[in-house]
């Protein structure tokens, strides 16, 4: 068996993940198959299984990559104003190819313990990262500090979910963006 160089392995994994996002978004997680993902990437099913043992494993990797932007919030946007960062989060959300997938995964969590665990870990890590970012912003004096950062993170997460819902059901993205900005300002200033 030929040796696979680490760089190639990462490229191959990334291609699989991107294909899985497309397939999951088009067909839904439950109806998607490993065969379809392999076909989309242009590899054999056996090759696919050398990288990922199941759809749940691919999903976990997708979730970890999607979370990375939020998990690195404090580090990535250290010198930015809080409102700029939250505006960037909005733009990341509307440009996400997996917006509908996110809602499907949340729904699947009630029936699949593996997916529930992945989703719960993802949610908790995003919330913790957002809380840390908000605490840092409070210490800098860029946002109000009379409300606990954990509560602010919960409120912003709920707002984010509502905005995602509005976009998913087809409400005009410019109107949604305006409401996002006004809501974030009302919550944080």
Q: Whereabouts are the PLM-identified features?
A:
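Amphipathic alpha-helical packing segments from all-alpha helical-bundle domains
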Residues: 75, 94-97, 113-140, 151
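C-terminal peripheral helix-coil segments that are non-catalytic and often amphipathic
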Residues: 83-91, 128, 132, 136, ...
């Amino acid at each position: 068996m030929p040796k696979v160089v680490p760089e190639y392995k990462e490229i191959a994994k990334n291609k699989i993940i991107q294909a899985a996002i497309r397939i999951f978004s088009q067909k839904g997680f439950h109806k998607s198959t490993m065969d379809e993902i392999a076909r989309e990437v242009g590899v054999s099913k056996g090759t696919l299984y050398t990288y990922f043992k199941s759809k749940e494993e691919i999903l976990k990797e997708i979730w970890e990559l999607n979370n990375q932007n939020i998990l690195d919030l404090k580090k990535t946007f250290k010198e930015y104003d809080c409102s700029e960062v939250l505006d960037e989060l909005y733009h990341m959300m509307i440009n996400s190819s997996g917006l509908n997938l996110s809602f499907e995964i949340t729904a699947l969590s009630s029936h699949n313990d593996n997916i529930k665990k992945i989703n719960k870990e993802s949610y908790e890590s995003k919330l913790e990262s957002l809380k840390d970012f908000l605490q840092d912003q409070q210490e800098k004096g860029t946002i109000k500090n009379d409300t606990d950062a954990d509560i602010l993170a919960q409120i912003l997460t709920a707002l984010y979910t509502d905005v995602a819902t509005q976009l998913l059901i087809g409400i005009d993205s410019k109107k949604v963006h305006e409401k996002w900005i006004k809501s974030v300002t009302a919550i944080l200033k």
